[in-house]
């Protein structure tokens, strides 16, 4: 693995919150100067690559992967996709986690799912099923997410306490079989 690929992977997983220079340097065991050189290489790679939609930005010593400006119109159109499209499995997973664990941060959602949830969160925000509900009082002050009144309408319920209790949902026999161990 190259430093560039490791930086790219870390920034991808960090999503919109990005990572500080100090945190990246620590993760990669690089000096800040050596890391800045690698970040510059990555930035130049994205600038030169016309087949990539990504670019690297830095704000207040925090680095993020974002889409290039030329994709703004396409992404705006995507964000306005009508709600009659079904939600992806990832979006449904994230929506369920937010509904049952709210208020919750993206990192906490990622920890539960084991994968990055930025895309699903963005889609759910665009569909007004979830909202930002403040910031958690921890280092980095990450956004907290909660469901909206539209979520209640969408689910056909009046209050969150009408959600099915998680313990009431029984896994299918096939799912149980996956977790059985053979002695």
Swiss-Prot record:
InterPro entries: ScpB_csome_segregation, WH-like_DNA-bd_sf, WH_DNA-bd_sf. The keyword Cytoplasm applies. Its main location: cytoplasm. It comes from the Bacteria. Transmembrane segments: none annotated. HAMAP family: ScpB. Homodimer. Homodimerization may be required to stabilize the binding of ScpA to the Smc head domains. Component of a cohesin-like complex composed of ScpA, ScpB and the Smc homodimer, in which ScpA and ScpB bind to the head domain of Smc. The presence of the three proteins is required for the association of the complex with DNA. Participates in chromosomal partition during cell division. May act via the formation of a condensin-like complex containing Smc and ScpA that pull DNA away from mid-cell into both cell halves. Belongs to the ScpB family. This is Segregation and condensation protein B. It comes from Streptococcus pyogenes serotype M1. The gene is scpB.
